[in-house]
Amino acid sequence: MILYIDSVSRALALRQLKKTMKFFEKFMPYHGGHHMKYPEENYHSFQFFKYHSFRMFTPGNFPILFYGNTKEVKDLVLMTRYLKENGYVTNYCSDECKKDNTRTHHNMTQSEIYDHQMLLCDPNVVLMNKPIKKCLYGNINSYHLYNYGKQFWTKYKDNRKFSALVTNDGHESTLEALKYTDDIIYNYLTSLYDQNLLKDTTVLMVSDHGTVLPSIYFLSDFFQKEGRLPMLFILVNDRKNMSYYDQYYHIQKNQQTFITGYDFYNTIGHLLYGDKYKDIENKTNEHDTPKSPFGESLFNYINPMKRNPKNYQNMDTHICK
C-alpha cells in the first residue's frame, strides 16, 4: 500500500500530520534500559532520515520511484504491471486528472490500466497549488480518495492487493493546507488497523521531494534542506517473521543511510517477489525488470561507505545535505 503526497518533506510531515505521525511512531522501537523494546508485537515502523530527492520537481523523481529509471529512457514500465502479472488486484486514486498526469509525468512511459481507479478531475475543485481547502460535496478532496481506498481494501481483504493513493495536498506555498488531511489519513490507517486489515501488508508513505513552491521560504536555508529531504515512512506487518531477522536488521540500519528513489523502487520489487528477488536481473535500457541497478532493497544491506551522491548522474549533487 502506497500513500503518496507530492512535495512533502519529512520535517513538514512531522509538523502538519501530527496524528498520522503518532500512528507510525507507536510502532517504532525505543530504548528500555539495556534493551530495545517494541510497542506492538506484530508491527514495526521505520522513518528514513537520509532519503534524498534527485531534483526539486516531480518529473525528476517520480519516474525513478515507480518506473525505476529516469524520464530520459523511453517506454518505461510501471511497477504496477509486475504486480498484476503476479495476481495482485490493483487500485489507483488521485486528485489529479489522468490526462494531466500523463502530460506532466508520464509522456515517456507506457500507459497502465488499473483494476480499480478513482480520479477527481473537476478543475474548479482540484485547484492544485492553491493554499486553501480543496473540497468536493462538503468534504476535503482527500476524504473521497481515502474513503474509496478503504472500500477497496475492505472488499478485497482476502486477496493479494495493491493500492496507491496519490494526492497533492502538500503542493502549495504556505505549508498549511496539508494539516487539513491529517485526520483523514489517521482515521484511514487506524480503521484498517483496528479491523486487522493491515495484516500481511506493508504501508509506504512517501513523497518525491520536499517543499519547492515559490514563497518566502525560497530565501532561507530551511528551504534548501527541506526541499531535498522528502518523507518516507514504512510500516511492516509480522516483524517476527522477517527471514526475516536479517531483513529487519538491515532496514533498521538503513534508516540512517543515504537512500534514493531507486531504493524505494527496488523495495517494492523485493516485497513483490520475496526471496526470488535476488535472482531477478537488473533493469537495462533494453531489458525492463522490477530491479534497478542503481538501488537496493531497503530490506537488504546497504553499505553507507559506498553511497556517494556523485555516483548518480542525474542528481543535483550541490543540493546534498
Please give the residue ranges for each predicted region.
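Short amphipathic alpha-helical face segments that pack within enzyme cores
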Residues: 19, 78, 180-187, 263-267
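Intrinsically disordered, low-complexity regions enriched in proline, serine, glycine
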Residues: 12-14, 33, 92-93, 201, ...
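A long, amphipathic alpha-helix that forms part
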Residues: 136-157, 161-217, 223-227, 231-235, ...
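Substrate-binding rim/cap in mid-to-C-terminal beta-strand-loop elements of soluble/periplasmic
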Residues: 52-69, 168, 219-274
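Polar, surface-exposed loop/tail segments
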Residues: 102, 247-266, 270-321
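Hydrophobic, well-ordered secondary-structure elements that form the walls
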Residues: 83, 208, 264
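Histidine-centered active-site microenvironments of extracellular/periplasmic hydrolases
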Residues: 105-113, 194-200, 205-246, 285-308
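Active-site-proximal alpha/beta segments of enzymes that process anionic O-linked groups
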Residues: 2-176, 296
